[in-house]
Each structure stands twice: as C-alpha cells, then as structure tokens.
C-alpha cells in the first residue's frame, strides 16, 4: 500500500502546487540590457517612496545610466542635473553630465562643464573628443599627452585617430589591443571601418564576417557588410580572385536589397535607421533619392553627397551645384565630389573660375597624406594634372593604378584621353577600342577614336565609323573631325570627301575652301608619285566631287589638274 502511494506521487497523481515566479530585480534587467524595463522598475521604486537619501541617489544614478544607454541623453542630463543640485553632490557627476552634452552635440556647454570637473581619465578622454569636435588642434595634443595606457584611453585615442582620418594609426591601436584582449571581438568592426575608408574592401569584408560569425544579428555590422559589398560592386575595381569577398560577392550582391529591407524591419537606434534608409536608396539605384535623401541630410553627411552625385548622373548640374553652396567638405571624398561638381559646371558654362576651383580641390585631395597613396588619391592627382595640361604625369599616375581597373570603361577612357592629349595616338587607340559599354555610342568617344585612326594612318576606319553613325548631328560632327584632322595629317583624299559631305549640308565659302585645299593637297601628292594607282584612283574621285558642285573658283582648279594629267599621261577622267 505504501509503495502504491509512492508510485502515485511519482506519476504526478494528485494536486500540484505552482512555484511562485520571482519578480525581476534591477540586476536582471541590466544583465539582459533591458534598459526600458530597468527604467520602469526604477521609476516605480522612486515613486513608492520610503527611501533614505543614499538609496534614492543610487536609484537616480541607475536611472540616468539607463537613459544614457538608451541614447536618451536629454533625460539622462536632466537626472544628472537634478542630482548635482543636491548638497554634497559628488564632483564626478559633472563629467557624466558633460558626456550627455557631448552626445547632444552641445560641445561648448560640454567643455564648460568638464573644465570645472576633476581631471579624471574619463574627463581627459571627454575633453580630447570635445576639442576634436571644436577643431582645437592644440588642446587635442595636450589631452593626448595626458592619456594613460589603460584600455579605455587606448580605445579613445583610436577613435580620435579615426575621426581625424588617421586610419592606419587607429588600426595599429586596435591591433595592439586585440593581441592582449582577443575577446574584444567588436574591434573587428572598428578595424573594418578603417579598412573600408582606406579602400581595402576585401580586408574590411573579412573582419566584418569574423564579427558576424559571433554576433549574426548585429544591425551595424550587417549594414557595414552590405555597404562594403555595394561599394565594391559599384566601384568596378578588380578584387583579388582568391579572397572571400570575390567568392561571395555575386551571390551576396543579389540579396543586398532584401537584406537591407529585412534589417529595417528590426528595432533600430535612430542613427542606424537613418544610415540603413540612406543605404537602401543607393542599393535601389537611387530610385527614391529625391524622396528620401533630402530628409536625411541633417542626420547623415553622405546623404547630401549622394544627392549631388544623383543630380550629376542625371546631368542636372544646376541642381548639383546648388547643393554645393551650403556644403563645406571635410573628408577627401567630399572634396572629390565638390571638385567633380565644379568641374562639370565649369565645362558646361565655360567658367574658368569653377574649373580652377575644381583643379585646386583635386590637387588638395591628391596631396593629402590621408589618401595620397590610395586609388582615390592618385585619381585626384591625375585629374588635377589633366586640368593643368601635364598629360605625361597624368599617364604616370593612372598607370600606377591600372591593375585595379582592368575592365573599367571610365578608367580606360581617362587614360586614353591622356595618351591622346600627349599625342601617343597608338596607345590611345588601343585603349579606346577596349571600351565596351554605352560610351562607344557617344559622339565624344567617336570623335576621339576617329582622331586616333587618322593620326595612326587609318582614315578608312574613321570613315567607316562615320558611315555607321545614324544620328545626323553626330554624323556631321564626325565629318568635321575627319575633315580637319585628315587635312592636318596629309590624308587629303578623306579630307576632300569629308569637306564635300559637309559642304552639301553647309555650302559656305569656308567649307569650299577646305575641299579645294584638300583637293590641291592630293594633287600635289599625285604629282610626286605619278604612277601610284591608288592616288590616281583617289584623284579621279575627288575631281568628280569638285565638278559635282560647281563653284566660282573650281573651274581653274579642275583645269590645272586636267592639264597636268594630260601632259603626264595620267588618266584621271572617268
């Protein structure tokens, strides 16, 4: 009977009593990073009362801390101010309040408060960052020299280096910290940011991937990964085929938009949400640029930059230059965008002033120690030198980065133009022919290639390209290039044909003079090579063209040519 009773209890027969759940304490909320829950608990305890001064102050401090961690710096500042107004308030509260003012971008106020506080390590780090925001270089160096060798001081220094665009210095600090504290995996993201800024996308990609293996749900890391993918795809630079980035870029590139849309469905801090919205516009080829980017400009500097680029890509140079009026560049990339805008505006309006400003901006970026030896830095130097007509130096700079742009049409065109202006027509022609995209259909491309053909003694190729051009305006432009360049290059047969076609559409004295001069030039060549069958055939055709469209002076020219042909027994009569 006793055994049966025991079995019934073991089998769960009979009533069971639920164990009462333990109410969460402050430590539970803090350990789970549930700061909203912690704030609710703290406010409840504060309203309940029955607290002595020490207990109340402790709860208020935790309340301020939770507001701070939620980035609600205004509320945190209010709590710290309330505590500071009490008798015998701890002096370090001023530093905490100054930190709130710093994140509220109230730098002057943060400086004023911090200067009255004890010079603790936290205060020194804060003052160094405040000085950075106020562009006070002297004070930055002063507080830098006061830093110790603690982890916090080293990481603060790395952050300042990053903000000053001293990316390599920041990387060295992060690398040193990781050697002694490999558990600080988050520093991989900081280093990835540095490498991304330095145009080493494959290194940045590997570092972010390493972090995401441990924290796959990090919104910031996911956004950074997608940004690196986007930048790599759109820059069209060559990526090391053996790298993890090269192996994954095609597949991951296909899901960039859906990945970013999924990320935006998460609960994000406002700053991260702004960045993600901005990047989603880029991933969608700026389809919603005009609707989204203007509202983001006050939150994200890149929004203005990309809106300027959007207008430039749409050939809305007037709108782009308008956005530059209130735009004070800080980073080399921002200076590049402003330089490009001034360049385009200067070219469209023939404004030497804007072209000179663009030249100065390009030179400034190219000579900057921050990007001097990067791809962007060398491209900037090349642009400056091109505007300065130093084409041999342009070629030197562009050749130094050619390996990164093996199939990039924009790069090929820039290098080809430099060779063309340097009068190395053979090298220019080879590069122009390698262009494979829509630029081949533009009149500027065809005009430059035609010039190369003519100077490389291939006028027939230039003529054939003109015949395949359907747009009447482009066709006429090509005829003018062929006529003038063939005349200069002593290719008088094609010069005559081109001037003849131009004269049909525009029968001016100038065009007739060009045709007459080309005919006379071909006649002189024939006179020196009387038995050349090609020249005889060409002269026969040109005489026919001159006779087709009579002019007041053409009879004399034809008479001279025919008399010479008859005297020398050369048949130029059809």
From Swiss-Prot:
Keywords carried by this UniProt record: Cell projection, Protein transport, Repeat, TPR repeat, Transport
Sequence ranges of the TPR repeats: 20-52, 57-90, 151-184
Pfam families tied to this protein: TPR_19
Subcellular location: Cell projection, Cilium
GO terms assigned for molecular function: intraciliary transport particle B binding
Coiled coil stretches, renumbered: none
Source superkingdom: Eukaryota
Gene inactivation effect: Structural cilia defect: cilia are short and lack distal portions.
Gene3D superfamilies in alphabetical order: Tetratricopeptide repeat domain (1.25.40.10)
The keyword Repeat appears for this protein: yes
Record-annotated disulphide pairs: none
InterPro entries linked to this entry: TPR-like_helical_dom_sf, TTC26
GO cellular component: ciliary basal body; ciliary base; cilium; intraciliary transport particle B
One GO process term, biological-process aspect: cilium assembly
Family label: Belongs to the IFT56 family.
Protein role: Component of the intraflagellar transport (IFT) complex B required for transport of proteins in the motile cilium. May be required for ciliary entrance and transport of specific ciliary cargo proteins such as che-3 which are related to motility.
Subunit structure: Component of the IFT complex B composed of at least che-2, che-13, dyf-1, dyf-3, dyf-6, dyf-11, dyf-13, ift-20, ift-74, ift-81, ifta-2, osm-1, osm-5 and osm-6.
Protein name: Intraflagellar transport protein 56 homolog
Native source species: Caenorhabditis elegans
